[in-house]
Amino acid sequence: MADPRERVPPGNSGEETIGEAFEWLDRTIEALNREAVNHLPRELIFQVWQRSWAYWHDEQGMSTSYTKYRYLCIMQKAVYIHFKKGCTCLGRGHGPGGWRPGPPPPPPPGLV
């Protein structure tokens, strides 16, 4: 009888997958920030980043990638709720900076 346990396919040691996951995380955060700045106030986006970093990285001692992941989860929820509540931008966005005038903010620290 054959061994029923799953085996790792050849060529997938896991290290390539982890590197791809970190790249995906960075790309996803950058894309989400570019979209969020059209729908949410800049101050909110920046504060979420600062508080995520202060809590998860500085206070809890979590890794940079985990901190980015938690930030991503919070921002995805914020954008989802914004759309669910009836975003009326119809794909055009609310303009740079959400509801506030001015140019869009720079990306949160550490994401450049």
From Swiss-Prot:
Role noted for this protein: Plays a role in nuclear translocation of the viral pre-integration complex (PIC), thus is required for the virus to infect non-dividing cells. Targets specific host proteins for degradation by the 26S proteasome. Acts by associating with the cellular CUL4A-DDB1 E3 ligase complex through direct interaction with host VPRPB/DCAF-1. This change in the E3 ligase substrate specificity results in the degradation of host SAMHD1. In turn, SAMHD1 depletion allows viral replication in host myeloid cells by preventing SAMHD1-mediated hydrolysis of intracellular dNTPs necessary for reverse transcription.
BP term (GO), one: symbiont-mediated suppression of host innate immune response
Subcellular location(s) of the protein: Virion; Host nucleus
Gene3D superfamilies xref list: 1.20.5.4730
Keyword Transport tagged: no
Species whose genome carries this gene: Human immunodeficiency virus type 2 subtype A (isolate D194)
Official protein name in the record: Protein Vpx
Family: Belongs to the lentivirus VPX protein family.
Keywords: AIDS, Host nucleus, Host-virus interaction, Inhibition of host innate immune response by virus, Viral immunoevasion, Virion
Record motif Nuclear localization signal, residues: 65-72
Region (Binds to human NUP153): 61-80
Assembly and binders: Interacts with the P6 region of unprocessed GAG. Interacts with host VPRBP/DCAF1, leading to change substrate specificity of the CUL4A-DDB1 E3 ligase complex. Interacts with host NUP153.
Note in the entry: This isolate is from a Gambian case of 'neuro-AIDS'.
A Gene Ontology cellular-component term: host cell nucleus
